[in-house]
Regions:
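Flexible, membrane-associating and regulatory peripheral segments of lipid-active enzymes
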Residues: 2-188, 193-208, 218, 391-395, ...
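Serine-dependent carboxylesterase/thioesterase catalytic core
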Residues: 40, 44-47, 51, 55, ...
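Helical cap/lid subdomain of alpha/beta-hydrolase-fold lipid enzymes
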Residues: 112, 119-120, 131, 258-407
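Short, flexible hinge/linker loops that cap or flank conserved catalytic cores
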Residues: 162-165, 199, 235, 268, ...
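Short, contiguous acidic/charged loop-to-helix segments that flank catalytic cores in large enzymes
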Residues: 186, 211-215, 384
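Short glycine/proline-rich turn/loop motifs
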Residues: 203-210, 376-382
């Protein structure tokens, strides 16, 4: 059956855009929204606390009348103060945003730097769905990055960015609130897994950057489309593709595999393995605790404004509560390998399962709802972020790849 023509990756719901520096605003608009939202929540809490106090005073004989008068005066003064803060900060930051729009080059230098990228990635983790929905230029579009800059998804750009482009690729996908720089080891410590994959197996490392605040399902669907166009745009015919995802990155890669199977995409045919490092397949206890705290804060009038602040965290963060589901009927020809770690040196220590790597429990990192060629490994004495550059983690990945390689 003839395959239907697909939309280019710059169109449709799951758009893939190379130019991440377009839009109407940058940091000032995001700061304006944050300041005004926080001011509103503080005002609500102030009103709730003061209201309960005045309610009690107005029920006491002799002082009820004066209390009511003080309440009117208090409410008028407080209201004018918060209104001034709201409009004053809004006007100042709106003016700053107007200046930013007139200086695009300066804005690009900031967002293109490593520090700027780190800040932008953190903003996207917390509010990325809002940034994307509001068209804010700080929303990160999915793209490969080389030296901090996006690479357009066309053959000429890929050929220029990867002069040693071969037929074997490894796409590395970072986790929540990070960018491609997280894969780099510290000075004198750890291994560069991307370079090791290229040196030992000939897989050219491609580093993906994306908006971690979007829903995991949406990012997975975007990645599925992205990989399909990478397959057709790469300068050489791709013979082998592996995906390496850390934390949320592994979940998004899993979602992409599900979506690719449902849509009959081509890239899974050349994809040999998906490797997940510390990915919370069954959810993260940290986000479940966050949800419990949010619910508790909503239980009283005084703390409800704080609950609304907590509830404003991005959909991507909230999706980590339980992890993505999987369709057991989805055929998976791709080998999937999961690595979980514990802070304790002994993975069988009673605290090992409970602590996990500090963010993800051992069970959530190694258990899964997926069917097919699945294997997992447990390694002790490694924290969540150390999984990215730990030599023992790479050694396990290398063993799996050698086992899967044809004789």
């Amino acid at each position: 059956m003839k395959r239907a023509r697909r939309k280019p990756p710059t169109e449709g719901k799951h758009a893939v855009k190379a130019d991440q520096y377009t839009g109407d605003s940058r940091y000032s608009e995001a700061a304006k929204a944050a300041v005004q939202a926080t001011t509103a929540r503080v005002r609500e809490m102030h009103r709730a606390i003061a209201g309960k106090t005045f309610d009690v005073l107005e029920k006491i004989p002799l002082i009820a009348g004066p209390a009511a008068l003080v309440r009117v005066t208090h409410d008028a003064i407080a209201g004018s103060v918060y209104t001034s803060i709201h409009h004053g900060s809004g006007s100042l930051l709106a003016a700053t945003a107007a200046i930013e729009r007139r200086l695009p080059a300066a804005g690009e230098d900031v967002t293109g730097s490593r520090i700027g990228s780190t800040l932008r990635s953190a903003l996207n983790a917390g509010f990325g769905d809002y940034l994307a929905a509001s068209g804010n230029a700080l929303a990160i579009p999915m793209a490969l990055h080389v030296e901090g800059r996006p690479v357009p998804l066309d053959t000429a750009s890929l050929d220029a960015a990867y002069p040693s482009a071969g037929s074997r690729l490894a796409v590395l996908i970072h986790g929540l609130a990070f960018d491609e720089y997280c894969w780099l080891p510290g000075e004198g410590t750890g291994v560069d897994i991307g370079r090791k994959l290229e040196a030992d197996f000939g897989h050219v490392p491609l580093y993906l950057r994306y908006n971690t605040g979007l829903a995991i399902a949406d990012n997975g669907a975007s990645l599925a489309v992205f990989l399909e166009f990478l397959l057709s745009a790469w300068p050489q015919k791709i013979e082998s593709l592996i995906l390496v995802g850390h934390s949320m990155g592994g979940l998004i890669a899993r979602e992409a595999c599900e979506q690719a199977a449902a849509d009959d995409l081509l890239w899974p045919q050349v994809t040999t393995m998906l490797i997940c490092l510390g990915s919370p397949h069954l959810g993260s206890p940290v986000e479940r605790l966050g949800q419990a705290v949010t619910t508790a804060l909503h239980s009283t009038d005084i703390t409800a404004p704080l609950g609304r602040i907590a509830a404003a965290r991005s959909q991507g963060v909230q999706d980590l509560r339980f992890g993505p589901k999987a369709n057991p009927r989805t055929p998976h020809a791709i080998a999937m390998r999961f690595i979980g770690s514990t802070l304790t040196d002994d993975v069988d220590h009673p605290l090992g399962e409970w602590l996990g790597d500090g963010l993800v429990t051992l069970g959530s990192a190694t258990a899964h709802p997926v069917t097919g060629n699945i294997r997992s490994a447990r390694i002790g004495g490694i924290g969540h972020m150390a999984l990215l550059t730990e030599p023992r983690v790479y050694a396990q990945v290398a063993r799996w790849l050698r086992e899967l390689a044809p004789a």
